[in-house]
Amino acid sequence: MEFRLPSLPVFLSFLLFFLMLVRHWKRSKGQGKPPPGPKPLPILGNLHQLADGLPHYAVTKLCRKYGPVMKLKLGQLDAVVVSSPEAAKEVLKTNEIKFAQRPEVYAVEIMSYDHSSIVFSPYGDYWREMRKISVLELLSNRRVTSFRSIREDEVWNLVQFISENEGCIINLSERIFTMTNDIISRAAFGNKCDDQHNFTALLEEILQIGAGFAIADLYPSLTFLRPLTGMKPALERIHKKMDKILEEIVTEHQIKRKAAAKNNTEFEEEDLVDTLLNYAEANKNEFHLTTDQVKAVTLDIFSAGSETSATSMEWAMSELLKNPRVMKKAQEEVRQACKGKSKIREADIQNLEYLKLVIKETFRLHAPGPFTPREARETCEIGGYTIPAKAKILINLHAMGRDPTIWKDPECFQPERFEGSSIDFKGNHFELIPFGGGRRICPGISFATANIELGLAQMMYHFDFKLPNGKSLEDLDMDENFGMTCRRKENLQVIATTRIPFEK
């Protein structure tokens, strides 16, 4: 039989097909198995799928479809959403060094003095030193205990305000945020600063635009968009005002220290700014801490300490009002434990086990932030999927807190689910990590928890609450806002009735 060579077109087609196979094999070998996810659109990526409602609800809905490790294209960014305890453990513990970086956020770049804060500084020597300062000096258990009298004073101020406005409509959200701001202001600055109202108003603006879903963050290469969207001038305006306040605070502390040195009198540390300045002086030969870095860390502590405590307390009170059975049980516990007292102290509430369950259940349904962000420092794997270097990792706390495979009746507020359970929220159990986990876990857990426990216990002890204007508990709006933290969309308005009179 006569043998014929294939025609040139057939040969070229076969060669082209073979080369495409080789190219695909090399690419798949280099990239590994990518996580599943919805198909992105040009330019937008998957942003159009997050536009309907709050982003964390939209992301959670997609996670239910595509699994616990899901890829998204957010504008120009490659993002991987992790929504199971097992996958979260791989990020925060198994491969914690590979994911020890925080993704860049444009608002943070401006507000944190070029990433000088503890929360947002790049992983490296500076971050390690600041982490050590925060754990051993600024927010140690000893330091948190030393602020007990401040917490008691400011919570009593809240109780007194509610008592004086008994029967009137109270904006409880506003009063809770005022209380936590006063606590952190006195702990950080030594007193309530003169510009505290302006300071907290500026802070609220930052929290709304600093969640990492702004145009400047989603399209980082398009730097010309920053002034066009108004984000850059807005941030620069906020930073200028906030820097002026922080500069005055730090300068005032430095003047007091110099005066003490000049008079040969011992300077007594009183607040967190003093602690930072003392550390800078004691370690100036090994570690140079600039004034801007002191301001960055101070802002870090104020924003995280105040916002986390207040948001969690606001949601706890909302859930207690929405669930009168739980409210009654919490009230009975604290009223029995502190029976006969006209005011209660922190030492009186250490054994309120049901209150601790209420707080734990609040963290499950209402983590202060819906996502814990990380960035892959190198190519690695999660759940058998290859994660490229520089990918933005979003640990979806919102999804895990509402996952029916983890929690029975996940949408129900049931503190009893934690009775007899060893699950805590301090980074050891990855189904409940409101403060994150691993090396970059929030160092202020003890500080925030102490504020929340005392504030809730005092309100439960002294008052009964109802909704204004004859509203039933079923009418209580539980809608959220989206930002760096997830507050209530509408402020919590209540009417209080005194059950146990307060005497300061």
UniProtKB/Swiss-Prot annotation:
Mainly expressed in fruits and leaves. It is found in: Membrane. Pathway: Secondary metabolite biosynthesis; terpenoid biosynthesis. Its cofactor is heme. CDD domains: CYP71-like. Its main location: membrane. It comes from Azadirachta indica. Belongs to the cytochrome P450 family. It catalyses: dihydroniloticin + 2 reduced [NADPH--hemoprotein reductase] + 2 O2 = melianol + 2 oxidized [NADPH--hemoprotein reductase] + 3 H2O + 2 H(+). The chain crosses the membrane at residues 2-22. Monooxygenase involved in the biosynthesis of limonoids triterpene natural products such as azadirachtin, an antifeedant widely used as bioinsecticide, and possessing many medicinal applications including anti-tumoral, anti-malarial, anti-rheumatic, antibacterial, anti-inflammatory, anti-pyretic and diuretic effects. Catalyzes the conversion of dihydroniloticin to the protolimonoid melianol. It holds the Pfam family p450. One of its GO terms (cellular component) is membrane. Its EC number is 1.14.14.-. InterPro entries: Cyt_P450, Cyt_P450_CS, Cyt_P450_E_grp-I, Cyt_P450_sf. Heme binds at C442. SUPFAM superfamilies: Cytochrome P450 (SSF48264). The gene is CYP71BQ5. This is Melianol synthase CYP71BQ5. GO terms for molecular function: heme binding; iron ion binding; monooxygenase activity; oxidoreductase activity, acting on paired donors, with incorporation or reduction of molecular oxygen. Keywords: Heme, Iron, Membrane, Metal-binding, Monooxygenase, Oxidoreductase, Transmembrane, Transmembrane helix.
